[in-house]
Amino acid sequence: MEGHVEEGSELGEQKVLIDNPADILVIAAYFLLVIGVGLWSMFRTNRGTVGGYFLAGRSMVWWPVGASLFASNIGSGHFVGLAGTGAASGLAVAGFEWNALFVVLLLGWLFVPVYLTAGVITMPQYLRKRFGGRRIRLYLSVLSLFLYIFTKISVDMFSGAVFIQQALGWNIYASVIALLGITMIYTVTGGLAALMYTDTVQTFVILAGAFILTGYAFHEVGGYSGLFDKYLGAVTSLTVSKDPAVGNISSTCYQPRPDSYHLLRDPVTGGLPWPALLLGLTIVSGWHWCSDQVIVQRCLAGKNLTHIKAGCILCGYLKLMPMFLMVMPGMISRILYPDEVACVVPEVCKRVCGTEVGCSNIAYPRLVVKLMPNGLRGLMLAVMLAALMSSLASIFNSSSTLFTMDIYTRLRPRAGDRELLLVGRLWVVFIVAVSVAWLPVVQAAQGGQLFDYIQSVSSYLAPPVSAVFVLALFVPRVNEKGAFWGLIGGLLMGLARLIPEFFFGTGSCVRPSACPAIFCRVHYLYFAIILFFCSGFLTLAISRCTAPIPQKHLHRLVFSLRHSKEEREDLDAEELEGPAPPPVQNGCQECAMGIEEVQSPAPGLLRQCLLWFCGMSKSGSGSPPPTTEEVAATTRRLEDISEDPSWARVVNLNALLMMTVAVFLWGFYA
C-alpha cells in the first residue's frame, strides 16, 4: 500500500519532460509546417469575401473535404476520451465512431443536396429560408455557440491539458494559451481554406503518429491475441482506502467488465446498451454530422456534389481507424499500467492524475510517455497538438460564421463585406479569451469519463435539433410554429435532465451520485431517443393544427423538391441576408460609389500590410465589383447539384462497399 502511494505521488508530481534535441526538433518542424501551409493558403486563396473566407470559395476537391471532415471531428478529446473509455470499459465506445460510417453517408446523399440548392452558408440560415421568421435561426445560433464554448472547447482544453501535464510538465496555462494563439493566427488570417489545407496536413500527421504508437503498444503487450488474453486480468493491486467512509472497495468497481470485448451489450445492464447505441447514438450523430456547422461547412466548400460525396466516403473509411488506433491502445495501457490507469482508491488516483474519480483519461498520454523513444515522442506530441489545434480552429471559424452571419447581421443589416470580415475576426479573438477564462473551470472538473461527459450533454440538448432538421427536409407540411415550439419543448425536457445531473454530479462507482432516479436513472442515449420522438411529435402536432407553408416558398428547400426549377419566393425575403448595396446618389449608384471612394483616404503602408494579413485588402480582389448578372450566374453554379453519371455510379458503388465493410466489422465485434 505505502509503496504504491509513494509511486503514485512521484507519478503525479514528476512528469517526463520532452527536453531532448530530437523531440524539440520534431515539434519545431511540425509547427513550421503548419504555419507554412497557413501562409501558403493566404497567398493562394480568396479571403477577401465572405464566401471566400467562410466557404473556401466552393473550390475544394474530394480529398481535402474528406480529410478535413475527419480531422475536424477527431480532436484531442478522442485520443484522451476514446482511449480512456476503452481502458475503463472495453470496445463498446468504438461504436461511437463506427456509427458515423452510416450517418456521414446520410449527410452526403440526403442533407447536403438540399443545403446546396437552398444556397445557404450556415444551418440557422437554412432554417430561416425554410420556415421564415427570426426566432428559430436566432435560437439555433445561440444554442450552437453555447455548445461550442462549454462542451467542445472545454473538452478539447481538458484533454489537451491532460496530455501536456503527462508528457511535458509545463505550466498548463502558458502551454494552452500558446496553442490558442497559434491556432488563432492561422484561423484569423486564412479563413476556411487555411483550415481545410492544414486539416489535410494534420490528418496525415495524426494517422502516422497513431499508427506508430499502436505498433509499439501491440508489440509490448504481445500482439492482438495478447490484448484479448490479458485485458480481463488488468486489475489494480490497490483496493483498500485509508478513508473509513470508503474502506474496502467492491470488485465491481475495479474488475474489467465481462462484456468488454463486445460492441453490442445488454439493453438493461450494459454500460452502452445496444438499442441505445444503434438508435440513440444515430440521433445524436445525426445532429453532429448533418446539422452541425463545423461539419456541414466543410461539405458546403466542396467543388460539386460528387466531390462532396467522395469526401464523405473518405471520411467514413478514416473513421474505421479509431477502434484500432485509440480504443485498443487504451485497453493496452490498462494492461501495462494497471495501478495508474485502472486506479480505484480515491487518494491514490488523486496522486496519480489529480482527480479522485479515476485516471483512465491518462491511458493514451501514459503510453506516449512510457513507450515512445526520443523523436517519436515528439512526433506524438505534435499529433496531439495537431488534433487540438485542428478542432479548436474549426470551432473558432464556424462559430465566427454563425455569429457574423446569423446574429451580427440582425444588429447591422446593412453591414458591408469588410465590416462582416472584421467582426468575424474579432469574434475569434473573443472566443480565445473565453477559452482561457474557462480553463480553471475545466481543470477543476476533471471527473468521470470524458467521452461520457460530451455525449451526455449532447444527448440532452441535440435531439430536438435533429428532429426539426429531419422534419424540415423530409416533411413539407411542417411549419415555423411547429418547429419553434418543438425546439422549445425539447429544450425544456433536456434541461429537466441536465440541471439535476449537473447539480448532484454523476458520481463514481466508489461514491455514487445522489441524483434522484426519476431524473438520472435512464441512460443518456435512451433519453435521447425519448427526447427526439417527443420533440418530433410536438413539432408535427402543432404544424398540423396551424396553416401550412405554401409550396411556392419550398422549392429546393425540401428533399422532394430539390430538383425543382421553379422560382422560389423566400419567406421574409425583405430581410437583408448580407451586405446592403451602396446608396443611390441623385439616382446614380455609380456616383455614390465614386463619392465614397473619394472620401476614403488611401491607407498607409502599415495599414495596407495589416489589411492584407487579415484578408481585407481591396487590392487583393484584383477586379471590379461583379455585376448583377455575374452574381446571379455564380449563385446558380453554387446551387447546382447535377452530377456526371459515370462518376456518380463510382461514388455510389464506393458507398455500398463502405457500408458492407462497416456491417462486417459491427458483426465481427458484436
Swiss-Prot record:
Ligand binding (Na(+)) = 71, 74, 387, 390-391
Function, as annotated: Electrogenic Na(+)-coupled sugar symporter that actively transports D-glucose at the plasma membrane, with a Na(+) to sugar coupling ratio of 1:1. Transporter activity is driven by a transmembrane Na(+) electrochemical gradient set by the Na(+)/K(+) pump. Unlike SLC5A1/SGLT1, requires the auxiliary protein PDZK1IP1/MAP17 for full transporter activity. Has a primary role in D-glucose reabsorption from glomerular filtrate across the brush border of the early proximal tubules of the kidney.
UniProt xrefs under Gene3D superfamilies: Sodium/glucose cotransporter
**Known glycosylation sites:** 248
Keyword ATP-binding appears in the UniProt entry: no
Similarity section: Belongs to the sodium:solute symporter (SSF) (TC 2.A.21) family.
- What is one process in the GO biological process aspect for this record? sodium ion import across plasma membrane
Compartment list: Apical cell membrane
The GO molecular function terms of this record are: alpha-glucoside transmembrane transporter activity; D-glucose transmembrane transporter activity; D-glucose:sodium symporter activity; metal ion binding
Q: Which residues lie on this side of the membrane: Cytoplasmic?
A: 43-61, 113-134, 294-307, 405-422, 476-480, 546-649
Q: Name one GO cellular component term.
A: brush border membrane
Subunit note:
Forms a heterodimer (via TM13) with PDZK1IP1 (via N-terminal transmembrane helix); this interaction enhances SLC5A2 transporter activity.
The protein's name: Sodium/glucose cotransporter 2
The keyword Isomerase belongs to this UniProt entry's keyword annotation: no
Q: Which Pfam families match?
A: SSF (PF00474)
InterPro entries, alphabetized: Na/Glc_symporter_sf, Na/solute_symporter, Na/solute_symporter_CS
TM spans, by residue?
21-42, 62-83, 92-112, 135-164, 172-193, 194-215, 274-293, 308-329, 374-404, 423-444, 450-475, 481-503, 522-545, 650-668
Q: What is its main location?
A: membrane
